[in-house]
From Swiss-Prot:
Keywords, in A-Z order: Copper, Hydrolase, Metal-binding, Oxidoreductase, Transferase, Zinc
EC assignment: 2.4.2.1, 3.5.4.4, 2.4.2.28
Role this protein plays: Purine nucleoside enzyme that catalyzes the phosphorolysis of adenosine and inosine nucleosides, yielding D-ribose 1-phosphate and the respective free bases, adenine and hypoxanthine. Also catalyzes the phosphorolysis of S-methyl-5'-thioadenosine into adenine and S-methyl-5-thio-alpha-D-ribose 1-phosphate. Also has adenosine deaminase activity.
Subunit structure, as described in the record: Homodimer.
List of residues binding Zn(2+): 55, 91, 108
Provenance organism: Borreliella burgdorferi (strain ATCC 35210 / DSM 4680 / CIP 102532 / B31)
InterPro entries membership: Cu_polyphenol_OxRdtase (IPR003730), Cu_polyphenol_OxRdtase_sf (IPR038371), Cytotoxic_necrot_fac-like_cat (IPR011324)
GO MF entry, a single one: adenosine deaminase activity
Catalyses which reaction(s): adenosine + phosphate = alpha-D-ribose 1-phosphate + adenine; S-methyl-5'-thioadenosine + phosphate = 5-(methylsulfanyl)-alpha-D-ribose 1-phosphate + adenine; inosine + phosphate = alpha-D-ribose 1-phosphate + hypoxanthine; adenosine + H2O + H(+) = inosine + NH4(+)
Protein name according to UniProt: Purine nucleoside phosphorylase BB_0467
Transmembrane in keyword set: no
Presence of the UniProt keyword Zinc in the record: yes
Length: 229
């Protein structure tokens, strides 16, 4: 994967026929402003599709007539005419592309979505649409990484009975008596038994001052977008 920094966004290039981007400062939109007019780097032919995100594990198959702002946190589509959009302020954006079936997907995966296994549910959706998992390319976009994402002992205790010790050891780090969580590591280890092509941007929303971070700024948000070319 090649990460390219543009004026208003990062681009994650894994193939010539798909576009994956993550916006950065000073680009800033409110939800009610989501439209092609305000995403001037998205082709006018693409219909913007997005959800009312509530940290769920709900995923929608998107057709051209999909109604925006339904409650959920994942989108999948085989349409050439749509751009899938999700908004972030520290949570993990996960992009999907089947280079054979030409299917795109996008997940907003906060810790709640991750712990509810939304990424596995997206894989099931791809298989249901005819994808072979070996043809999938998955990209973890910018998120609040374990260098910065401090959590409480109660947070760790609440998930300790739900997942294996190996998975937790791969996802949590202790430094100087403090506990830190890495959302991408959690999801990466969930997928360890699958034959998948996975790429990690390794960009931290808290560290990088050109990205919006709720924990650092308490305001604003970035957007992840994916569309076929």
């Amino acid at each position: 994967m090649k990460t390219i920094e543009h004026e208003l966004y990062y681009e994650f290039r894994i193939a010539d026929d798909v576009k994956m981007i993550y916006t950065k400062k000073p680009f800033n939109l409110k939800l009610k402003e989501l439209s092609n007019d305000n995403f001037n780097f998205v082709p006018r032919s693409k219909k913007i599709k997005y959800l009312k995100q509530l940290h769920t594990d709900i995923i929608y198959k998107v057709e051209d007539d999909f109604i925006n702002f339904q409650e959920g946190d994942g989108l999948i589509s085989s349409s050439l005419d749509v751009a899938l959009v999700a908004y972030f302020a520290d949570c993990l954006p996960i992009y999907f592309y089947d280079s054979v079936k030409k299917i795109i997907g996008l997940i907003h995966s906060g810790y709640k979505g991750s712990f509810n296994l939304i990424i596995l549910k997206m894989l099931f959706m791809f298989e249901k649409m005819g994808s072979a998992l070996k043809d999938l390319k998955i990209v973890f976009g910018p998120y609040n990484r374990s260098c910065c994402y401090e959590v409480s002992e109660i947070f760790l205790k609440e998930v300790s009975n739900k997942f294996s010790k190996d998975l937790l050891n791969a996802s949590f780090v202790t430094r100087d008596g403090k506990i830190y969580f890495d959302n991408a590591s959690f999801n990466l280890n969930l997928l360890s038994s699958f034959n998948l092509n996975i790429y990690n941007s390794k960009l931290c929303t808290y560290c990088l001052k050109n990205l919006y971070s709720y924990r650092r700024l308490r305001e604003s948000q970035s957007y992840a977008l994916i569309w076929r070319i």
